[in-house]
């Protein structure tokens, strides 16, 4: 058995997984947690290789693991470098040859097996070939998308790749929100229809939205999407009439001297000011009691449905995974 590694050392990208901690698997792995049109094939794969099988695989190599409350599994030492060391040691014990700086240029299937030619002219032959070259996400770690050309050589079709688990670029995004975080519900609209909603901590940036909810929804932004937008609900567990009533009470209470403090205790200060401005509620020195019912209604609407047009995502360097590629239906299980 021989491993052909295009880079000068194996496992370079592995060191970056899980923010350097290496998320090995998830105890809650299930088809509904994946983005795929072929859920039947996905279910079959997960049934054949459940999380316990993954943990047994690493356990047999001597790696002790730790499972978090949300089901994520990491090496007990929480160091990706340890996972790489364990894998390299297993290769050595099994007598596997590893050829680094050995990028593959061509692969061809013939009557007697496969022939492989590298970029520097070396030739290899094998009864079986495993193409495990990754996609295009994180090119700074060595991935360049060249594996898709090899897949085509073997007769596979390749759907147009696109960045996934990546922050969203939003048009007309308010300035000054960089670094602000909020627990909320984030929805993605594609061509006017809600394509998905994720709840959790959203991070506001100078370009748009980040955080787990935004990155999860980015997987729905495939090629061909003509119009996309987001909706931020800062109070997903509170019905609109209840929120509006609370705002009306705050305006009438006299507790808040100006709009500058009206949303104090509800959302972050910078966020509150940006929302008020988006509703045209200026200046901030204005007395809350002067707001009309229509203006209070507009403010409540913004807190429940703050909308932004999505221009796209950040580039491949910020993406964690690749969408598209070889269809799951063409992968034998």
Mark where each language-model region is:
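General beta-strand structural signal in soluble alpha/beta enzymes
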Residues: 3-5, 67, 98-100, 131, ...
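A glycine-rich dinucleotide-binding beta-alpha-beta segment and adjacent secondary-structure elements
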Residues: 100, 273-333
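Short hydrophobic core segments
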Residues: 2-4, 104, 123-143, 151-152, ...
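Glycine-centered tight beta-turn/hairpin loop motif at sheet-sheet or coil-to-beta transitions
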Residues: 119-121, 193
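A conserved short coil-to-beta-strand element within the FAD-binding core of flavoproteins
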Residues: 100-113
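An anion/pyrophosphate-binding glycine-rich loop and adjacent beta-alpha core
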Residues: 8-10, 15-16, 24-31, 64, ...
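Conserved N-terminal/central alpha/beta ligand/cofactor-binding core
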Residues: 6-97, 102
């Amino acid at each position: 058995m021989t491993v052909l590694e295009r880079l000068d050392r194996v496992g370079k990208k592995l060191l970056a997984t899980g923010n350097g901690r290496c998320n090995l698997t998830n105890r809650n792995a299930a088809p509904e947690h994946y983005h795929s049109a072929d859920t039947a094939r996905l279910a079959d794969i997960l049934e054949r290789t459940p999380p316990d099988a993954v943990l047994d695989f690493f356990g047999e190599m001597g790696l002790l693991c730790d499972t978090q409350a949300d089901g994520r599994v990491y090496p007990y030492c929480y160091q990706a470098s340890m996972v790489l060391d364990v894998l390299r040691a297993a290769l050595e014990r099994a007598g596997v040859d590893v050829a680094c700086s050995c990028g593959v240029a061509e692969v061809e299937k013939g009557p007697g097996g496969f022939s492989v030619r590298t970029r520097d002219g070396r030739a290899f032959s094998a009864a079986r070939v495993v193409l495990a070259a990754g996609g295009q996400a994180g090119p700074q770690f060595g991935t360049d998308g060249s594996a898709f050309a090899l897949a085509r050589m073997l007769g596979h079709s390749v759907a147009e790749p696109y960045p996934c688990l990546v922050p969203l670029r939003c048009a007309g995004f308010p300035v000054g929100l960089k670094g602000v975080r909020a627990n909320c519900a984030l929805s993605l609209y594609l061509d006017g229809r809600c394509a998905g909603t994720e709840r959790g901590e959203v991070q506001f940036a100078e370009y748009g939205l980040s955080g787990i909810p935004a990155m999860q929804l980015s997987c729905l932004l495939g090629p061909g999407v003509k119009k996309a937008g987001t909706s931020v609900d800062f109070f997903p567990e509170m019905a609109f009439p209840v929120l509006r009533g609370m705002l009306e009470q705050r305006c009438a209470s006299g507790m808040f001297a100006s709009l500058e403090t009206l949303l104090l205790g509800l959302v972050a200060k910078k966020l509150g000011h940006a929302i008020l401005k988006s509703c045209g509620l200026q200046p901030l020195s204005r007395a809350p009691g002067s707001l009309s019912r229509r203006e209070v209604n507009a403010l409540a609407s913004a807190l429940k449905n703050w909308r932004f047009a999505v221009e796209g995502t950040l580039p491949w360097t910020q993406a964690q995974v690749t969408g598209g590629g070889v269809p799951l239906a063409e992968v034998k299980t």
